[in-house]
A protein has these predicted regions:
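Residue-level recognition of well-ordered beta-strand positions that form the cores
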Residues: 65-69, 82-84, 118, 134-138, ...
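Bacterial signal peptide processing site
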Residues: 22-24
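Short, surface-exposed binding/anchoring microloops in extracellular/periplasmic proteins
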Residues: 35-88
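Short beta-strand elements
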Residues: 143-162
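Immediate post-signal-peptide N-terminus of mature secreted/exported proteins
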Residues: 29-35
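Sec-dependent bacterial lipoprotein signal peptides
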Residues: 1-19
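A short, sequence-level motif marking secondary-structure junctions
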Residues: 52, 97-101, 151-157
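Short, solvent-exposed, Trp/other aromatic-anchored flexible loops in extracytoplasmic proteins
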Residues: 90-145
Length: 162
């Protein structure tokens, strides 16, 4: 019984010591966490549930969901989606392409995709009025079309203490 108590006290002491090994300087610093949601639509397409997360260390862009609202997309064989900032020059945040090589058609609606890393090269100030979505399609006849939607961006969170 004494051995069990000695082991329990040793484990408790180790736990207390290790709990103090947290990065103390970072716990007192203010960390910037910003979360933006975005969506937009026109008569042809709708983008919803998009999210951009910036925490000072990592940047993540979830493209959201694409929905077609027209019959123009029933014979698509190739398409690409791009989310970009339209400033002095076009800054691409996320881009995906799908190409069917079998001669069949592709459903354009669905998840746009996700990317993490250095998503925003400069600051996030440009997100509010300059975020755009672009869909380029090619149909069975080889006809190419481009659809653009300006995305309404809303900042959900601001500065938080960690």
């Amino acid at each position: 019984m004494k051995e069990i108590m000695a082991v329990m006290l040793s484990l408790l002491a180790c736990t207390v010591l290790l709990a103090g090994c947290n990065n103390f300087s970072e716990s007192n610093e203010e960390q910037s966490l910003k979360v933006y949601s975005f969506s937009g639509e026109n008569e042809y397409i709708s983008v919803s549930n998009g999210v951009i997360i910036l925490d000072g260390k990592e940047e993540i862009c979830y493209g959201g969901d694409l929905k077609v609202m027209s019959d123009n997309f029933s014979d698509i064989t190739t398409y690409s989606t791009t989310i970009y900032i339209n400033g002095s020059e076009k800054e691409t945040l996320l881009s995906n392409s799908v190409d069917d090589q079998t001669g069949e058609t592709i459903d354009v609606s669905g998840n746009i995709g996700k990317i993490s890393g250095d998503v925003l090269r400069d600051s996030d100030d440009k997100l509010t009025d300059n975020l755009w979505f672009e869909l380029k399609t090619t149909n069975l006849s080889g006809e190419e079309n481009t659809y653009r939607v300006q995305l309404k961006t809303t900042e959900i969170t601001k500065e938080v203490k960690k």
